[in-house]
Amino acid sequence: MCIRDRNTFSDKIGLKTYSRGMGALGLPGDLSSASRFARVAYTKLNSVSGDGEEESVSQFFHILGSVDQQRGCCKVAEGKYEITIYTSCCNATKGIYYYTTYDNHSINAVDLNREKLDGRELVRYPLDEKMKINYVN
């Protein structure tokens, strides 16, 4: 657990907290910002992606999944936890926005070219947050 400005790793070690997630400092994969940044940079630089759009998008979400915040690991207030609410990327050339949410890891896409690009109305889409489980039997 982590609460800002509080060392929850051990009262026997004088750790100075500079980031939420430091309650796990010293454990492999701690949740501090610096550790998460280093882990995602390492993962990005050492992972292999295919040439296609779908493979690249899938790999992007796997890379960022290496630093997801899970509910319960980083407590910020009573009953409140730091989590990865959503993850997103965009193919700026094709105008496609991809996202996943905490509760729905299916990749959702919004193709901006399917809308009136010269329109004057704001277009909004509800986040698809309901988990979809694909039963194969």
Tell me the role of every PLM-derived stretch.
Residues 4-137:
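C-terminus-biased signal that marks the final domain/tail of proteins
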